[in-house]
UniProtKB/Swiss-Prot annotation:
GO terms for molecular function: RNA binding. Required for rescue of stalled ribosomes mediated by trans-translation. Binds to transfer-messenger RNA (tmRNA), required for stable association of tmRNA with ribosomes. tmRNA and SmpB together mimic tRNA shape, replacing the anticodon stem-loop with SmpB. tmRNA is encoded by the ssrA gene; the 2 termini fold to resemble tRNA(Ala) and it encodes a 'tag peptide', a short internal open reading frame. During trans-translation Ala-aminoacylated tmRNA acts like a tRNA, entering the A-site of stalled ribosomes, displacing the stalled mRNA. The keyword RNA-binding applies. Keywords: Cytoplasm, RNA-binding. It comes from Haemophilus influenzae (strain ATCC 51907 / DSM 11121 / KW20 / Rd). The gene is smpB. Disruption phenotype: Essential, it cannot be disrupted. This is SsrA-binding protein.
Length: 161
């Protein structure tokens, strides 16, 4: 009797942790991705990177630019694999119009936040973002450090009681 393969609990393929550090995220939207077969196989193997990716608009359509999906070594040899190709985002017209209008405001951009599986479909969570200044980043770090210190103090206070 063979053992069943244990499936990982997490459906997340790739995260863009840098985006939350560098930007204020105003709004989040889920979008589908138009992928080729070798890209799906590579994503299942966890070979995706969205750290420097963002959304661009061309001819009324949205595209994910800068995402890197490395091809597997065992991928087909007769297909040319471009790891950094621009991938089309699958959104309905209302979402596209809304995103386009919001992104055209001063200081706003659209960045990829995470790449994950939703049942059998690959989805990307994109966020409407506004850039942070250096002082804002410092404030976030101070706030995070204070939270850790406060938790440590509370933990020690409960032990002494």
């Amino acid at each position: 009797m063979t053992k069943k393969k244990v499936k990982p609990n997490s459906n997340t393929i790739a995260l863009n942790k840098r985006a939350r550090h560098d930007y204020f995220i105003e709004d989040e939207i889920e979008a589908g991705l138009e992928l080729q077969g070798w890209e799906v196989k590579s994503m299942r193997a966890g070979k995706a990177n969205i750290s420097d990716s963002y959304v661009i608009f061309k001819n009324g359509e949205a595209f994910l630019f800068g995402a890197s999906i490395q091809p597997l070594n065992v991928a087909s040899t007769h297909i040319v694999c471009d790891p950094t190709r621009t991938r089309k985002l699958l959104l309905n017209k209302r979402e596209l119009a809304s995103l386009f209008g919001k992104a055209n405001r001063d200081g706003f951009t659209i960045v990829a936040l995470s790449l994950y599986w939703k049942s059998a479909w690959a989805k990307v969570k994109i966020g409407l973002a506004k850039g942070k200044k250096q002082q804002d980043k410092r404030d976030d770090i101070k706030e995070r450090e204070w939270k850790v210190t406060k938790d440590r103090i509370m933990k020690n206070a409960h032990r002494r009681s």
